[in-house]
């Protein structure tokens, strides 16, 4: 597995401070969970015959699963990896109903730390089933470039702060900004 420092930072935040993901989930999926909602961290390691796949995050809020991947650059194969990850998550949490199974994919998104004009708002793939039915697998993307430091604070997307400097060419935080973050974290 090729981890980047960004993967490590993202996974550590999810593991140690999962409540930071709630505003991001609300932003992306148009939900309105309170910041103190109960969050269950699901396994992010999934065994497959050809090896283990590791996702960045898999969270359960209420009865909904959420899967967020952090990507440092726009990778055109990401949609295929997301289908693989989501299928592994769905299989692991499949519900047996008599002789039939219900496999539900999590609500997923990709956080692109760097993106270009070609980075889509949704990653999509056509999935053709044996009966000929085609379903569009579509997941939203979150692009750091779309957020200013002010919008990060206004929307309480503090999870994005460690990644903000990498998508800016000029210094982006003042001493006052750092004190503001310290006050927010100290109050939690």
Regions flagged by a language model, labelled:
Residues 1-188:
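Elongated, amphipathic alpha-helical interaction scaffolds
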